[in-house]
Amino acid sequence: MHKSAMSVSQKLWPSLPLQHRIRRMWWTYAALAFLAVVASLWTSGEIGQHRAEAALEEQARMDVTLNAALLRTVLEKYRALPFVLSQDTALAAALVGNDAGTFERLSQKLEILAAGTKAAVIYVIDKDGIAVSASNWREPTSFVGNDYRFREYFQGAVERGQAEHFALGTVSKKPGLYISQRISGSNGLLGVVVVKVEFDDVEADWNASGTPSYVVDERGIVLITSLPSWRFMTIGRIAEDRLTAIRESLQFGAAPLQPLPLDMVRNLGEGLDVVEIVMPGDAGKTRFLDVATSVPATGWHLQHLVALGPSVDAGIREARMLALLILLPLLAGAAFLLRRRHTIALRISSEQQAREELERRVVERTLDLSQARDRLQAEIIGHKSTEQKLQAVQQDLVQANRLAILGQVAAGVAHEINQPVATIRAYADNARTFLDRGQTAPAGENLESIAALTERIGSITEELKTFARKGRGSAEPTGLKDVIEGAVMLLRSRFAGRMDTLDIDLPPDELQVMGNRIRLEQVLINLLQNALEAVAPKAGEGRVEIRTSTDAGMVTVTVADNGPGIPTEIRKGLFTPFNTSKESGLGLGLVISKDIVGDYGGRMDVASDSGGTRFIVQLRKA
Protein backbone atom coordinates (compact mmCIF):
# COMPACT_ATOMS: atom_id res chain seq x y z
CA MET A 1 0.00 0.00 0.00
CA HIS A 2 2.83 2.36 0.87
CA LYS A 3 4.71 1.59 -2.33
CA SER A 4 1.59 2.28 -4.41
CA ALA A 5 1.15 5.66 -2.73
CA MET A 6 4.79 6.51 -3.39
CA SER A 7 4.39 5.56 -7.06
CA VAL A 8 1.35 7.82 -7.45
CA SER A 9 3.20 10.63 -5.67
CA GLN A 10 6.15 10.31 -8.00
CA LYS A 11 3.86 10.56 -11.03
CA LEU A 12 1.98 13.62 -9.70
CA TRP A 13 4.95 15.65 -8.48
CA PRO A 14 8.21 16.35 -10.31
CA SER A 15 11.54 15.50 -8.76
CA LEU A 16 13.32 18.08 -6.63
CA PRO A 17 16.15 18.74 -9.18
CA LEU A 18 13.52 19.32 -11.88
CA GLN A 19 11.72 21.84 -9.64
CA HIS A 20 14.99 23.71 -9.06
CA ARG A 21 15.73 23.70 -12.79
CA ILE A 22 12.26 25.05 -13.66
CA ARG A 23 12.53 27.78 -11.02
CA ARG A 24 16.00 28.74 -12.27
CA MET A 25 14.77 28.97 -15.89
CA TRP A 26 11.91 31.29 -14.88
CA TRP A 27 14.30 33.57 -12.98
CA THR A 28 16.58 33.61 -16.03
CA TYR A 29 13.64 34.41 -18.30
CA ALA A 30 12.53 37.28 -16.00
CA ALA A 31 16.04 38.76 -15.99
CA LEU A 32 16.39 38.50 -19.78
CA ALA A 33 12.90 39.94 -20.31
CA PHE A 34 13.74 42.88 -18.02
CA LEU A 35 17.00 43.52 -19.89
CA ALA A 36 15.19 43.25 -23.25
CA VAL A 37 12.55 45.78 -22.16
CA VAL A 38 15.17 48.21 -20.84
CA ALA A 39 17.34 47.86 -23.96
CA SER A 40 14.32 48.18 -26.23
CA LEU A 41 13.08 51.31 -24.46
CA TRP A 42 16.54 52.89 -24.56
CA THR A 43 17.23 51.99 -28.20
CA SER A 44 13.78 52.98 -29.43
CA GLY A 45 14.04 56.21 -27.46
CA GLU A 46 17.32 57.05 -29.18
CA ILE A 47 15.84 56.21 -32.58
CA GLY A 48 12.68 58.20 -31.86
CA GLN A 49 14.74 61.16 -30.69
CA HIS A 50 16.96 61.02 -33.78
CA ARG A 51 13.97 60.84 -36.14
CA ALA A 52 12.13 63.64 -34.35
CA GLU A 53 15.23 65.85 -34.41
CA ALA A 54 15.74 65.08 -38.11
CA ALA A 55 12.13 66.05 -38.88
CA LEU A 56 12.47 69.23 -36.82
CA GLU A 57 15.76 70.02 -38.54
CA GLU A 58 14.16 69.71 -41.97
CA GLN A 59 11.24 71.93 -40.95
CA ALA A 60 13.56 74.42 -39.22
CA ARG A 61 15.79 74.74 -42.29
CA MET A 62 12.73 75.42 -44.43
CA ASP A 63 11.50 78.04 -41.95
CA VAL A 64 14.85 79.79 -41.64
CA THR A 65 15.18 79.86 -45.43
CA LEU A 66 11.73 81.45 -45.75
CA ASN A 67 12.51 83.98 -43.00
CA ALA A 68 15.80 84.88 -44.66
CA ALA A 69 14.00 85.29 -48.00
CA LEU A 70 11.43 87.59 -46.36
CA LEU A 71 14.18 89.69 -44.79
CA ARG A 72 16.11 89.87 -48.05
CA THR A 73 12.97 90.99 -49.89
CA VAL A 74 12.52 93.86 -47.43
CA LEU A 75 16.17 94.90 -47.76
CA GLU A 76 16.19 94.77 -51.56
CA LYS A 77 12.99 96.82 -51.64
CA TYR A 78 14.64 99.79 -49.94
CA ARG A 79 18.23 99.58 -51.18
CA ALA A 80 17.43 101.14 -54.54
CA LEU A 81 15.55 104.09 -53.05
CA PRO A 82 18.56 106.17 -51.80
CA PHE A 83 20.35 105.70 -55.11
CA VAL A 84 17.34 106.88 -57.12
CA LEU A 85 16.93 109.94 -54.87
CA SER A 86 20.64 110.80 -55.15
CA GLN A 87 20.15 111.13 -58.92
CA ASP A 88 17.21 113.54 -58.51
CA THR A 89 18.29 116.93 -59.92
CA ALA A 90 15.65 118.74 -57.87
CA LEU A 91 17.15 117.38 -54.67
CA ALA A 92 20.66 118.42 -55.75
CA ALA A 93 19.37 121.86 -56.73
CA ALA A 94 17.78 122.30 -53.29
CA LEU A 95 21.10 121.54 -51.59
CA VAL A 96 22.91 124.00 -53.88
CA GLY A 97 20.30 126.74 -53.36
CA ASN A 98 20.16 126.24 -49.57
CA ASP A 99 16.70 127.85 -49.43
CA ALA A 100 14.34 127.13 -46.50
CA GLY A 101 11.24 127.17 -48.72
CA THR A 102 12.82 124.72 -51.11
CA PHE A 103 13.77 122.44 -48.22
CA GLU A 104 10.17 122.52 -46.94
CA ARG A 105 8.79 121.54 -50.35
CA LEU A 106 11.41 118.78 -50.48
CA SER A 107 10.24 117.54 -47.06
CA GLN A 108 6.67 117.36 -48.37
CA LYS A 109 7.88 115.32 -51.33
CA LEU A 110 9.84 112.97 -49.04
CA GLU A 111 6.77 112.63 -46.79
CA ILE A 112 4.66 111.41 -49.73
CA LEU A 113 7.44 109.07 -50.88
CA ALA A 114 7.89 107.57 -47.39
CA ALA A 115 4.15 106.96 -47.06
CA GLY A 116 4.04 105.25 -50.47
CA THR A 117 7.09 103.03 -49.87
CA LYS A 118 6.34 102.47 -46.16
CA ALA A 119 9.87 103.59 -45.26
CA ALA A 120 10.23 104.66 -41.62
CA VAL A 121 11.95 107.96 -42.48
CA ILE A 122 13.58 109.50 -45.55
CA TYR A 123 15.77 112.52 -44.94
CA VAL A 124 18.49 114.63 -46.58
CA ILE A 125 21.68 115.76 -44.83
CA ASP A 126 23.83 118.58 -46.17
CA LYS A 127 27.58 118.31 -46.50
CA ASP A 128 28.05 119.65 -42.96
CA GLY A 129 26.01 116.78 -41.48
CA ILE A 130 22.84 118.81 -40.71
CA ALA A 131 19.47 117.31 -41.73
CA VAL A 132 17.75 119.90 -43.98
CA SER A 133 14.68 117.91 -45.12
CA ALA A 134 12.87 114.88 -43.68
CA SER A 135 9.68 112.95 -44.27
CA ASN A 136 8.82 113.33 -40.56
CA TRP A 137 9.16 117.15 -40.64
CA ARG A 138 5.64 117.58 -39.22
CA GLU A 139 6.24 115.31 -36.19
CA PRO A 140 7.67 116.28 -32.80
CA THR A 141 10.53 113.87 -33.46
CA SER A 142 11.44 115.59 -36.75
CA PHE A 143 15.00 115.00 -37.92
CA VAL A 144 15.26 118.47 -39.50
CA GLY A 145 18.05 120.50 -37.91
CA ASN A 146 19.74 117.53 -36.19
CA ASP A 147 23.48 117.01 -36.53
CA TYR A 148 24.40 113.56 -37.91
CA ARG A 149 28.09 114.07 -38.60
CA PHE A 150 28.96 111.44 -35.98
CA ARG A 151 26.80 108.76 -37.58
CA GLU A 152 28.69 106.03 -39.38
CA TYR A 153 26.19 105.92 -42.25
CA PHE A 154 26.90 109.64 -42.96
CA GLN A 155 30.66 109.20 -42.80
CA GLY A 156 30.54 106.01 -44.89
CA ALA A 157 28.42 107.61 -47.63
CA VAL A 158 30.77 110.62 -47.79
CA GLU A 159 33.84 108.39 -48.05
CA ARG A 160 32.57 105.44 -50.12
CA GLY A 161 29.48 106.80 -51.87
CA GLN A 162 27.00 104.58 -49.98
CA ALA A 163 26.69 102.88 -46.61
CA GLU A 164 24.39 100.72 -44.47
CA HIS A 165 24.33 100.98 -40.69
CA PHE A 166 21.98 99.43 -38.12
CA ALA A 167 21.53 101.59 -35.04
CA LEU A 168 19.10 102.92 -32.44
CA GLY A 169 17.60 106.25 -33.48
CA THR A 170 18.93 109.11 -31.35
CA VAL A 171 15.64 111.02 -31.67
CA SER A 172 12.97 108.34 -32.28
CA LYS A 173 14.64 105.77 -30.00
CA LYS A 174 13.58 103.12 -32.53
CA PRO A 175 16.10 100.70 -34.04
CA GLY A 176 16.44 100.40 -37.77
CA LEU A 177 18.75 100.03 -40.74
CA TYR A 178 20.02 103.30 -42.20
CA ILE A 179 20.76 103.07 -45.94
CA SER A 180 22.63 106.15 -47.20
CA GLN A 181 23.81 107.45 -50.59
CA ARG A 182 26.09 110.40 -51.36
CA ILE A 183 24.70 113.31 -53.42
CA SER A 184 27.34 114.85 -55.64
CA GLY A 185 27.35 117.91 -57.86
CA SER A 186 29.73 119.57 -60.23
CA ASN A 187 31.66 121.04 -57.29
CA GLY A 188 31.83 117.78 -55.35
CA LEU A 189 29.90 116.69 -52.26
CA LEU A 190 26.47 118.25 -51.81
CA GLY A 191 25.07 116.01 -49.08
CA VAL A 192 23.70 112.57 -48.22
CA VAL A 193 20.21 111.06 -48.61
CA VAL A 194 19.21 108.47 -45.99
CA VAL A 195 16.37 105.91 -45.87
CA LYS A 196 15.65 104.37 -42.48
CA VAL A 197 14.10 100.88 -42.56
CA GLU A 198 12.35 99.53 -39.48
CA PHE A 199 11.52 95.82 -39.22
CA ASP A 200 8.36 95.91 -37.09
CA ASP A 201 6.32 93.99 -39.71
CA VAL A 202 9.04 91.35 -40.13
CA GLU A 203 9.30 90.87 -36.38
CA ALA A 204 5.51 90.64 -36.10
CA ASP A 205 5.41 87.92 -38.79
CA TRP A 206 8.13 85.96 -37.00
CA ASN A 207 6.36 86.34 -33.67
CA ALA A 208 3.08 85.10 -35.17
CA SER A 209 4.77 81.84 -36.23
CA GLY A 210 5.28 80.94 -32.56
CA THR A 211 8.97 80.08 -33.02
CA PRO A 212 11.67 82.59 -31.98
CA SER A 213 13.83 84.10 -34.71
CA TYR A 214 16.52 86.76 -34.48
CA VAL A 215 19.26 88.38 -36.57
CA VAL A 216 22.79 89.02 -35.29
CA ASP A 217 25.54 91.09 -36.89
CA GLU A 218 29.12 89.98 -37.39
CA ARG A 219 29.87 90.85 -33.73
CA GLY A 220 27.06 88.61 -32.45
CA ILE A 221 24.74 91.47 -31.38
CA VAL A 222 21.00 90.84 -31.80
CA LEU A 223 19.57 93.45 -34.22
CA ILE A 224 16.16 92.12 -35.27
CA THR A 225 14.15 89.70 -33.13
CA SER A 226 10.68 88.33 -32.57
CA LEU A 227 11.35 88.70 -28.81
CA PRO A 228 11.79 92.44 -28.01
CA SER A 229 13.58 91.73 -24.72
CA TRP A 230 16.44 90.09 -26.67
CA ARG A 231 17.21 93.18 -28.79
CA PHE A 232 20.82 94.39 -28.50
CA MET A 233 21.83 91.35 -26.44
CA THR A 234 24.75 89.20 -27.59
CA ILE A 235 25.12 85.51 -28.38
CA GLY A 236 28.56 85.51 -26.75
CA ARG A 237 30.79 87.67 -24.63
CA ILE A 238 32.38 90.71 -26.34
CA ALA A 239 35.76 92.03 -25.25
CA GLU A 240 35.55 94.99 -22.88
CA ASP A 241 37.46 97.38 -25.17
CA ARG A 242 35.07 96.60 -28.04
CA LEU A 243 32.06 97.12 -25.74
CA THR A 244 33.41 100.54 -24.75
CA ALA A 245 33.88 101.53 -28.40
CA ILE A 246 30.32 100.39 -29.30
CA ARG A 247 28.79 102.33 -26.39
CA GLU A 248 30.76 105.49 -27.26
CA SER A 249 29.49 105.28 -30.85
CA LEU A 250 25.89 105.45 -29.50
CA GLN A 251 24.99 102.84 -32.13
CA PHE A 252 22.74 101.04 -29.66
CA GLY A 253 22.15 103.86 -27.19
CA ALA A 254 22.54 102.80 -23.57
CA ALA A 255 21.82 99.11 -24.23
CA PRO A 256 23.79 96.93 -21.76
CA LEU A 257 24.80 94.45 -24.48
CA GLN A 258 24.45 91.52 -22.08
CA PRO A 259 24.79 87.90 -23.33
CA LEU A 260 21.62 85.97 -24.12
CA PRO A 261 20.64 83.33 -21.53
CA LEU A 262 21.80 80.65 -23.97
CA ASP A 263 23.98 77.58 -23.38
CA MET A 264 25.38 75.38 -26.13
CA VAL A 265 24.51 71.67 -25.61
CA ARG A 266 25.98 70.09 -28.72
CA ASN A 267 26.78 70.87 -32.34
CA LEU A 268 24.97 68.80 -34.99
CA GLY A 269 26.71 70.25 -38.03
CA GLU A 270 27.30 73.49 -39.87
CA GLY A 271 24.71 76.04 -38.82
CA LEU A 272 22.90 73.54 -36.59
CA ASP A 273 23.14 73.36 -32.78
CA VAL A 274 21.17 72.14 -29.80
CA VAL A 275 20.95 74.93 -27.19
CA GLU A 276 19.27 75.59 -23.86
CA ILE A 277 17.67 79.02 -23.34
CA VAL A 278 15.84 80.69 -20.49
CA MET A 279 12.81 82.14 -22.30
CA PRO A 280 11.24 85.43 -21.11
CA GLY A 281 8.81 84.68 -18.27
CA ASP A 282 10.18 81.14 -17.71
CA ALA A 283 12.18 80.09 -14.67
CA GLY A 284 13.79 77.01 -16.20
CA LYS A 285 15.73 76.31 -19.36
CA THR A 286 14.10 75.15 -22.58
CA ARG A 287 15.96 73.06 -25.14
CA PHE A 288 15.86 74.30 -28.75
CA LEU A 289 17.20 73.34 -32.14
CA ASP A 290 19.12 76.42 -33.33
CA VAL A 291 19.36 76.70 -37.14
CA ALA A 292 21.48 79.50 -38.63
CA THR A 293 21.79 80.87 -42.15
CA SER A 294 23.50 83.93 -43.59
CA VAL A 295 21.49 86.87 -44.90
CA PRO A 296 22.72 87.59 -48.46
CA ALA A 297 24.45 90.92 -49.17
CA THR A 298 24.93 91.62 -45.42
CA GLY A 299 27.21 90.49 -42.63
CA TRP A 300 24.20 89.26 -40.71
CA HIS A 301 23.14 85.78 -39.66
CA LEU A 302 19.53 84.71 -39.12
CA GLN A 303 18.99 82.34 -36.18
CA HIS A 304 15.78 80.28 -35.95
CA LEU A 305 14.82 78.34 -32.81
CA VAL A 306 12.55 75.29 -32.71
CA ALA A 307 11.55 73.81 -29.34
CA LEU A 308 12.74 70.21 -29.06
CA GLY A 309 10.78 69.20 -25.98
CA PRO A 310 7.22 68.47 -27.19
CA SER A 311 8.13 67.03 -30.60
CA VAL A 312 11.09 64.99 -29.36
CA ASP A 313 9.15 63.69 -26.36
CA ALA A 314 6.31 62.67 -28.67
CA GLY A 315 8.76 60.97 -31.05
CA ILE A 316 10.42 59.10 -28.18
CA ARG A 317 7.05 58.12 -26.75
CA GLU A 318 5.76 56.82 -30.09
CA ALA A 319 8.97 54.88 -30.78
CA ARG A 320 8.89 53.28 -27.33
CA MET A 321 5.21 52.39 -27.68
CA LEU A 322 5.94 50.74 -31.02
CA ALA A 323 8.89 48.88 -29.52
CA LEU A 324 6.73 47.61 -26.66
CA LEU A 325 3.98 46.60 -29.09
CA ILE A 326 6.55 44.47 -30.90
CA LEU A 327 8.49 43.22 -27.87
CA LEU A 328 5.65 42.32 -25.49
CA PRO A 329 4.02 39.77 -27.85
CA LEU A 330 7.47 38.25 -28.39
CA LEU A 331 8.03 38.01 -24.63
CA ALA A 332 4.55 36.56 -24.20
CA GLY A 333 5.31 34.02 -26.92
CA ALA A 334 8.61 33.16 -25.24
CA ALA A 335 6.82 32.72 -21.90
CA PHE A 336 4.26 30.49 -23.57
CA LEU A 337 7.00 28.38 -25.15
CA LEU A 338 8.84 28.20 -21.84
CA ARG A 339 5.65 27.18 -20.05
CA ARG A 340 5.00 24.60 -22.71
CA ARG A 341 8.52 23.28 -22.33
CA HIS A 342 8.06 22.93 -18.60
CA THR A 343 4.74 21.17 -19.10
CA ILE A 344 6.45 18.72 -21.40
CA ALA A 345 9.25 18.22 -18.89
CA LEU A 346 6.72 17.51 -16.14
CA ARG A 347 4.89 15.09 -18.36
CA ILE A 348 8.13 13.31 -19.21
CA SER A 349 9.00 13.11 -15.53
CA SER A 350 5.60 11.65 -14.63
CA GLU A 351 5.80 9.09 -17.44
CA GLN A 352 9.32 7.87 -16.75
CA GLN A 353 8.24 4.29 -16.06
CA ALA A 354 6.14 4.10 -19.19
CA ARG A 355 9.11 5.13 -21.37
CA GLU A 356 10.81 1.73 -21.12
CA GLU A 357 7.69 -0.01 -22.38
CA LEU A 358 7.46 2.54 -25.13
CA GLU A 359 11.07 1.93 -26.14
CA ARG A 360 10.39 -1.82 -26.34
CA ARG A 361 7.45 -1.21 -28.63
CA VAL A 362 9.53 1.19 -30.68
CA VAL A 363 12.09 -1.55 -31.27
CA GLU A 364 9.33 -3.84 -32.51
CA ARG A 365 7.89 -1.15 -34.72
CA THR A 366 11.34 -0.24 -36.02
CA LEU A 367 11.64 -3.67 -37.60
CA ASP A 368 8.28 -3.20 -39.31
CA LEU A 369 9.31 0.27 -40.46
CA SER A 370 12.60 -1.03 -41.85
CA GLN A 371 10.75 -3.62 -43.87
CA ALA A 372 8.25 -1.01 -45.05
CA ARG A 373 11.14 1.26 -46.01
CA ASP A 374 12.73 -1.49 -48.09
CA ARG A 375 9.44 -2.08 -49.88
CA LEU A 376 9.05 1.67 -50.48
CA GLN A 377 12.56 1.93 -51.92
CA ALA A 378 11.80 -0.97 -54.25
CA GLU A 379 8.63 0.79 -55.38
CA ILE A 380 10.57 4.05 -55.95
CA ILE A 381 13.09 2.20 -58.10
CA GLY A 382 10.20 0.66 -60.05
CA HIS A 383 8.61 4.08 -60.54
CA LYS A 384 11.90 5.54 -61.78
CA SER A 385 12.28 2.66 -64.22
CA THR A 386 8.71 3.20 -65.45
CA GLU A 387 9.39 6.92 -65.81
CA GLN A 388 12.51 6.23 -67.88
CA LYS A 389 10.56 3.83 -70.09
CA LEU A 390 7.83 6.46 -70.47
CA GLN A 391 10.40 9.05 -71.53
CA ALA A 392 11.85 6.57 -74.03
CA VAL A 393 8.35 5.87 -75.41
CA GLN A 394 7.74 9.61 -75.68
CA GLN A 395 11.00 10.04 -77.62
CA ASP A 396 10.00 7.13 -79.87
CA LEU A 397 6.60 8.77 -80.48
CA VAL A 398 8.33 12.03 -81.39
CA GLN A 399 10.63 10.18 -83.78
CA ALA A 400 7.70 8.19 -85.19
CA ASN A 401 5.79 11.40 -85.79
CA ARG A 402 8.83 12.86 -87.49
CA LEU A 403 9.22 9.79 -89.72
CA ALA A 404 5.49 9.84 -90.52
CA ILE A 405 5.86 13.42 -91.66
CA LEU A 406 8.96 12.41 -93.59
CA GLY A 407 7.00 9.64 -95.32
CA GLN A 408 4.26 12.07 -96.29
CA VAL A 409 6.70 14.47 -97.92
CA ALA A 410 8.93 11.75 -99.42
CA ALA A 411 6.79 11.27 -102.54
CA GLY A 412 6.82 14.96 -103.31
CA VAL A 413 10.56 15.15 -102.70
CA ALA A 414 11.11 12.21 -105.05
CA HIS A 415 9.17 14.08 -107.73
CA GLU A 416 11.21 17.21 -107.08
CA ILE A 417 14.45 15.21 -107.39
CA ASN A 418 13.31 13.39 -110.60
CA GLN A 419 13.14 16.66 -112.52
CA PRO A 420 16.80 17.69 -111.93
CA VAL A 421 17.88 14.04 -112.48
CA ALA A 422 16.23 14.04 -115.92
CA THR A 423 17.83 17.37 -116.69
CA ILE A 424 21.23 16.06 -115.55
CA ARG A 425 20.79 13.10 -117.99
CA ALA A 426 20.08 15.48 -120.84
CA TYR A 427 23.04 17.74 -119.95
CA ALA A 428 25.31 14.67 -119.73
CA ASP A 429 24.25 13.44 -123.21
CA ASN A 430 24.79 16.91 -124.64
CA ALA A 431 28.20 17.19 -122.99
CA ARG A 432 29.27 13.84 -124.48
CA THR A 433 28.15 14.97 -127.94
CA PHE A 434 30.05 18.27 -127.59
CA LEU A 435 33.17 16.41 -126.45
CA ASP A 436 32.92 14.04 -129.46
CA ARG A 437 32.83 17.14 -131.67
CA GLY A 438 35.75 18.69 -129.78
CA GLN A 439 33.56 21.59 -128.53
CA THR A 440 34.91 21.84 -124.97
CA ALA A 441 33.32 25.19 -124.08
CA PRO A 442 29.66 24.08 -124.47
CA ALA A 443 30.58 20.80 -122.80
CA GLY A 444 31.99 22.72 -119.79
CA GLU A 445 28.82 24.80 -119.53
CA ASN A 446 26.72 21.61 -119.46
CA LEU A 447 28.94 20.14 -116.75
CA GLU A 448 28.60 23.32 -114.65
CA SER A 449 24.80 23.07 -114.97
CA ILE A 450 25.00 19.43 -113.86
CA ALA A 451 27.03 20.50 -110.78
CA ALA A 452 24.44 23.16 -109.86
CA LEU A 453 21.60 20.62 -110.16
CA THR A 454 23.47 18.13 -107.96
CA GLU A 455 23.88 20.85 -105.31
CA ARG A 456 20.11 21.42 -105.39
CA ILE A 457 19.46 17.68 -105.00
CA GLY A 458 22.03 17.58 -102.17
CA SER A 459 20.33 20.40 -100.23
CA ILE A 460 16.95 18.58 -100.48
CA THR A 461 18.35 15.23 -99.36
CA GLU A 462 20.46 16.84 -96.61
CA GLU A 463 17.34 18.55 -95.16
CA LEU A 464 15.50 15.18 -95.25
CA LYS A 465 18.44 13.38 -93.65
CA THR A 466 18.77 16.03 -90.92
CA PHE A 467 15.05 15.93 -90.17
CA ALA A 468 15.06 12.11 -89.97
CA ARG A 469 17.73 12.10 -87.21
CA LYS A 470 16.56 12.09 -83.60
CA GLY A 471 18.81 15.00 -82.74
CA ARG A 472 19.74 16.23 -79.32
CA GLY A 473 16.81 16.97 -77.03
CA SER A 474 18.66 19.61 -74.93
CA ALA A 475 17.86 23.26 -75.46
CA GLU A 476 20.43 25.41 -77.26
CA PRO A 477 20.36 28.75 -79.12
CA THR A 478 18.68 28.06 -82.47
CA GLY A 479 18.02 30.48 -85.31
CA LEU A 480 14.26 30.86 -85.71
CA LYS A 481 14.59 31.87 -89.36
CA ASP A 482 16.45 28.59 -90.14
CA VAL A 483 13.69 26.58 -88.40
CA ILE A 484 10.94 28.24 -90.47
CA GLU A 485 12.83 27.92 -93.77
CA GLY A 486 13.68 24.24 -93.05
CA ALA A 487 10.05 23.36 -92.32
CA VAL A 488 8.84 25.12 -95.46
CA MET A 489 11.44 23.32 -97.59
CA LEU A 490 10.30 19.91 -96.35
CA LEU A 491 6.66 20.73 -97.10
CA ARG A 492 7.31 22.37 -100.47
CA SER A 493 7.18 19.15 -102.48
CA ARG A 494 4.06 17.69 -100.84
CA PHE A 495 2.09 20.93 -101.09
CA ALA A 496 3.68 22.11 -104.33
CA GLY A 497 0.40 23.43 -105.70
CA ARG A 498 -0.59 25.23 -102.50
CA MET A 499 2.60 26.93 -101.29
CA ASP A 500 1.40 30.26 -102.70
CA THR A 501 -1.15 30.34 -99.86
CA LEU A 502 1.71 30.82 -97.40
CA ASP A 503 2.30 34.38 -96.13
CA ILE A 504 5.54 34.24 -94.14
CA ASP A 505 7.07 37.19 -92.29
CA LEU A 506 10.58 35.84 -91.66
CA PRO A 507 12.28 37.03 -88.45
CA PRO A 508 15.75 38.64 -88.56
CA ASP A 509 18.77 36.35 -88.88
CA GLU A 510 20.04 37.18 -85.38
CA LEU A 511 16.80 36.20 -83.58
CA GLN A 512 17.41 32.94 -81.70
CA VAL A 513 15.28 30.81 -79.39
CA MET A 514 16.14 28.08 -76.89
CA GLY A 515 15.44 24.65 -78.41
CA ASN A 516 16.62 22.05 -80.91
CA ARG A 517 16.26 22.85 -84.60
CA ILE A 518 15.06 19.39 -85.65
CA ARG A 519 12.40 19.15 -82.94
CA LEU A 520 11.23 22.74 -83.53
CA GLU A 521 10.98 22.03 -87.28
CA GLN A 522 8.81 19.02 -86.38
CA VAL A 523 6.47 21.32 -84.39
CA LEU A 524 6.24 23.83 -87.22
CA ILE A 525 5.70 21.11 -89.86
CA ASN A 526 2.80 19.68 -87.82
CA LEU A 527 1.17 23.13 -87.55
CA LEU A 528 1.77 24.11 -91.21
CA GLN A 529 0.59 20.72 -92.47
CA ASN A 530 -2.68 21.04 -90.51
CA ALA A 531 -3.14 24.63 -91.71
CA LEU A 532 -2.49 23.81 -95.39
CA GLU A 533 -4.89 20.86 -95.24
CA ALA A 534 -7.52 23.08 -93.55
CA VAL A 535 -7.45 25.71 -96.34
CA ALA A 536 -7.25 23.17 -99.19
CA PRO A 537 -11.04 23.29 -99.92
CA LYS A 538 -10.85 27.10 -100.45
CA ALA A 539 -8.48 26.74 -103.41
CA GLY A 540 -7.18 30.24 -104.32
CA GLU A 541 -8.88 31.93 -101.35
CA GLY A 542 -6.99 29.96 -98.70
CA ARG A 543 -4.44 31.80 -96.58
CA VAL A 544 -1.83 30.59 -94.07
CA GLU A 545 0.22 33.17 -92.16
CA ILE A 546 3.40 32.83 -90.09
CA ARG A 547 4.20 35.77 -87.83
CA THR A 548 6.83 36.27 -85.12
CA SER A 549 7.13 38.78 -82.29
CA THR A 550 9.23 39.27 -79.14
CA ASP A 551 8.18 40.43 -75.69
CA ALA A 552 9.85 40.26 -72.24
CA GLY A 553 12.33 37.51 -73.03
CA MET A 554 9.83 35.38 -75.01
CA VAL A 555 9.45 34.87 -78.76
CA THR A 556 5.96 34.20 -80.11
CA VAL A 557 5.39 32.30 -83.38
CA THR A 558 1.81 32.42 -84.69
CA VAL A 559 0.52 30.06 -87.41
CA ALA A 560 -2.92 31.22 -88.57
CA ASP A 561 -5.24 30.00 -91.34
CA ASN A 562 -8.64 31.05 -92.65
CA GLY A 563 -9.98 27.50 -92.78
CA PRO A 564 -13.29 26.28 -91.33
CA GLY A 565 -11.91 26.11 -87.76
CA ILE A 566 -11.71 23.20 -85.34
CA PRO A 567 -15.01 21.63 -84.19
CA THR A 568 -15.88 22.35 -80.58
CA GLU A 569 -15.93 18.70 -79.51
CA ILE A 570 -12.45 18.20 -81.02
CA ARG A 571 -11.10 21.50 -79.61
CA LYS A 572 -11.99 20.52 -76.01
CA GLY A 573 -9.55 17.61 -76.13
CA LEU A 574 -7.27 18.94 -78.84
CA PHE A 575 -4.07 18.15 -76.95
CA THR A 576 -5.32 14.74 -75.78
CA PRO A 577 -3.71 11.69 -77.47
CA PHE A 578 -5.71 9.99 -80.27
CA ASN A 579 -8.16 12.92 -80.52
CA THR A 580 -8.42 13.74 -84.26
CA SER A 581 -10.94 14.67 -86.94
CA LYS A 582 -8.86 13.12 -89.77
CA GLU A 583 -9.74 9.66 -91.01
CA SER A 584 -6.08 8.73 -91.48
CA GLY A 585 -4.68 10.62 -88.47
CA LEU A 586 -3.64 9.21 -85.11
CA GLY A 587 -4.21 12.40 -83.09
CA LEU A 588 -0.61 12.52 -81.81
CA GLY A 589 0.94 15.38 -83.82
CA LEU A 590 -0.33 18.27 -81.69
CA VAL A 591 0.19 16.34 -78.44
CA ILE A 592 3.83 15.70 -79.33
CA SER A 593 4.28 19.27 -80.56
CA LYS A 594 2.98 20.70 -77.29
CA ASP A 595 5.26 18.37 -75.30
CA ILE A 596 8.28 19.48 -77.36
CA VAL A 597 7.50 23.16 -76.77
CA GLY A 598 6.96 22.48 -73.05
CA ASP A 599 10.33 20.68 -72.81
CA TYR A 600 12.02 23.94 -73.84
CA GLY A 601 10.19 26.09 -71.29
CA GLY A 602 7.56 27.37 -73.73
CA ARG A 603 3.85 26.92 -74.22
CA MET A 604 1.38 26.32 -77.04
CA ASP A 605 -2.16 27.74 -77.20
CA VAL A 606 -4.91 27.61 -79.81
CA ALA A 607 -7.78 29.91 -80.75
CA SER A 608 -10.34 28.75 -83.31
CA ASP A 609 -13.72 29.77 -84.66
CA SER A 610 -15.59 29.57 -87.95
CA GLY A 611 -13.22 32.15 -89.46
CA GLY A 612 -10.08 30.11 -88.97
CA THR A 613 -7.56 28.77 -86.46
CA ARG A 614 -4.51 30.32 -84.77
CA PHE A 615 -1.79 28.32 -83.02
CA ILE A 616 0.39 30.48 -80.74
CA VAL A 617 3.78 29.03 -79.81
CA GLN A 618 5.84 30.87 -77.17
CA LEU A 619 9.55 30.03 -76.83
CA ARG A 620 12.26 31.40 -74.57
CA LYS A 621 14.49 33.94 -76.28
CA ALA A 622 18.17 32.95 -76.40
Curated annotation (Swiss-Prot):
GO cellular component terms, semicolon-separated: plasma membrane
Signal peptide start and end residues: none
Periplasmic side: 43-320
Subcellular locations according to the entry: Cell inner membrane
Enzyme Commission number(s) of this protein: 2.7.13.3
Phosphohistidine sites (modified residues): 415
Top-rank taxon, per record: Bacteria
Protein name: C4-dicarboxylate transport sensor protein DctB
Record organism: Rhizobium leguminosarum
Gene: dctB
